[in-house]
């Protein structure tokens, strides 16, 4: 029996494996493709102002951010997830943390990615870095 298969390494995504918040990059990606209305951007900026001052809870901030997906088809976003990963996320992976991911993979440990971000944005990361499990936000459609 391989004892290493019973060891798991857990990695947080935002501001750990990824040097920045993925939500900001996601909004930038949507904005660059003209897929997000200006009103939504304004709403996020105002909410973020209050969130940064701890006047808005994590839960409320997430609810505000997720309003973007209301009445939209998830498949439209899933189609661009791989390109988003390659262009926006992969270049911002933290080298030191990435080295730890590779170390644990080489040791035969299970790799678990944890994030509050949505699944479709994280699946390309999981595939590319060969994570074994993903714990994240699933959108209800």
Predicted features and spans:
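Active-site neighborhood of HAD-like aspartate-dependent phosphohydrolases
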Residues: 1-53
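Residue-level signature of catalytic and energy-coupling elements of molecular machines
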Residues: 15, 77, 115
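Conserved alpha/beta cores of soluble small-molecule-handling proteins
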Residues: 35-36, 52-56, 74-76, 95, ...
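Metal-dependent phosphoesterase signature
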Residues: 60-96
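Substrate-recognition/cap helix-loop segment adjacent to the acidic, metal-dependent catalytic center
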Residues: 106, 110, 117-141
